[in-house]
Design a protein with these regions (language model features):
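Short, well-formed alpha-helical segments that are part of the catalytic scaffolds
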Residues: 1-14
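Active-site-proximal specificity loops/subdomain of glycosyltransferases
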Residues: 4, 26-71, 79
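Ser/Thr-glycine-rich phosphate-binding loops at phosphate-binding pockets of nucleotides
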Residues: 8, 19-27
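A generic structural signal for alpha->beta connector loops
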Residues: 13, 37-40, 168
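Short beta-strand/loop segment that forms part of the nucleotide-sugar
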Residues: 14-22, 42-43
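Active-site acidic Asp-centered loop
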Residues: 21, 71-73
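Catalytic-site signature of metal-activated, phosphate-bearing donor transferases
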Residues: 50-62, 70, 77-247
Length: 247
């Protein structure tokens, strides 16, 4: 997932900060290969305690000027980047297209963007339920506060917002696509770093799972809700190609 994330966002942003949660794979090497000028920050957190992660993100953002957005590697921002020409203090809340792997036999390649290989899922436009499945992300040129508990504006911890204020920029969410061995391993690894305190507070429960449960959710919860999003995705891809620095 990391190569797709990096190759996409290096076309949009002049700089990035990647937080390394003590990875033991080739993640750091891949970042240095694809985005050699980006910063790699080793997380001060030893596990995935959700509120501590959000505090660390806020501290990093505080030292950055201009527009900033905190994303997971399963998320790709895409659309009309001219919105980011504004110098007025602004916070944009971006809704999600939730991508679902409905054709697992279709093997994907890192040589092409995911939006050219996978086309099914559901959209924030489909229903309130579908929007809430993956709430909005914030891109902002002002300081924002990520609350440690749920508020009327933001689901905390986790940095997801309950509403969106533009549909010209969106997030393509690939947490369930592609649903191959790599994707399954990534989803199963998360639970090994969720601390006891988060489990006691009921945080991150959706990460406590196994391969059978993940497969059941994909086949019975997400695939039945999915449709062909090609036309909707293409509108954002066209804007992306018009306005990004595609190499």
């Amino acid at each position: 997932m990391l190569p797709w994330f990096l190759n996409h966002h290096k076309q949009i942003f002049d700089h990035g900060v990647m937080i390394d949660y003590h990875s033991t794979d080739r993640s750091v090497e891949i970042i240095r290969e694809i985005c050699p000028t980006w910063d790699i920050v080793t997380s001060r957190n030893q596990d995935f305690q959700a509120d501590n992660i959000d505090t660390e993100v806020m501290d990093i953002e505080r030292d950055l000027d201009g527009w900033k957005i905190a994303l997971n590697v399963t998320e790709q921002m895409i659309g009309d980047y001219s919105l980011l020409d504004s110098i007025e203090p602004t916070q944009l809340l971006l809704p999600t297209l939730f991508m679902v792997d409905t054709d697992r036999e279709n093997i994907v390649s890192h040589e092409r963007p995911l939006y050219e290989q996978k086309f099914h899922g559901f959209s924030f436009r489909d229903s309130q339920r579908d929007f809430l499945e993956r709430r909005a992300r914030s891109i902002h040129n002002v300081s924002v506060y990520y609350p440690p508990t749920n508020t009327p504006e933001c689901m905390g911890p986790g940095r997801h917002y309950h509403n969106y204020n533009t549909d010209k920029l969106v997030i393509l969410y690939y947490g369930w696509c592609p649903f191959d061995q790599g994707g399954i391993v990534r989803k199963l690894q998360i639970q090994t770093q969720i601390p006891l305190i988060d489990r006691q507070r009921g945080w991150g429960f959706h990460h406590i799972t196994n391969k059978e449960t993940l497969t059941y959710r994909l086949e019975n919860e997400f695939i039945p809700r999915s449709r062909d999003l090609t036309e909707e995705i293409q509108q954002y891809v066209t804007k992306h190609k018009d306005l990004s620095n595609i190499l």
